[in-house]
Amino acid sequence: MQTPTENTAENTVFELRQYTLYGGKRDTLISLFEKNFIETQDVVGAHVLGTFRDLDDPDRFVWLRGFRDMQTRPQALEAFYGHSPAWLAHKKEANATMVDSDNILLLRPASSPPQLQSSALNSSASPAIYGVTIYYLGDVDERQFADFFVHALLPRLNASGVHPIAVLTTDEEPNNFPRLPVREHDRVFLWMARWASEDDCAPFAAQMRTWSGWRDKAPEAVLPAVMRRPEQLRLKPTSRSPLQ
């Protein structure tokens, strides 16, 4: 079996999956997931890249999954959800923890491949924090927003010591595994970064809440996507998350 570390570089399709759970059930789901659903997905081509606790919502479990391409995605998902002994044995218990599991963004790289350096699976979580910032595009052209990001936002991030490890945008191909719904009508552009600890992340998070002038260079065609404050997630890796 390949490890998640070996599979990371081949992914061109991604899912950012946010599950809303019943109160007090997050650790139950994480325990099930880490014991049963990481290697068993990876072996069929559905690569679990990271599993996280949302620091700002105790009832939210977030994970990132990757696939080689859209052609292999339905095959991998059918192999896992239709035939994997691990899923068939534990799906009722897992589903019983969830209020909602349909908050899914189907994504592709906006430019260069993500630098998602997975670690060997172990049993201890690092103190790292991952931040995800999500801009909702509406009808804004993704290429125009990407140009604004590269020339206006990215230099400000870099000047603050932040270097995104992934920049992703909505994959607008139809969902080819309809048993698992995705948010097909929400077009987004997002970036992801890593901090060594919550203390390292906190100054930037505070700074970003009071950023002034970041919209100044936005062309008129991009304005609808920047008038809404972006959604921000602060994510702490679980103990066996490939991303640590």
Named regions from a protein language model:
Residues 1-15, 20, 25:
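Hydrophobic, helix-prone linear segments
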Residues 12-14, 56, 128:
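Short, surface-exposed loop/turn motifs at beta-strand boundaries within globular domains
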Residues 2-5, 9, 28-50, 56-57, ...:
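An amphipathic, aromatic/His-enriched active-site/gating alpha helix that lines ligand/cofactor pockets
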Residues 52-53, 170:
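Short, solvent-exposed loop/turn elements at beta->coil junctions and helix N-caps
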Residues 56-59, 174:
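Short acidic/glycine-enriched loop/turn segments that link adjacent beta-strands
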Residues 16-23, 28, 109-179, 183-198, ...:
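Surface-exposed interaction/gating patches
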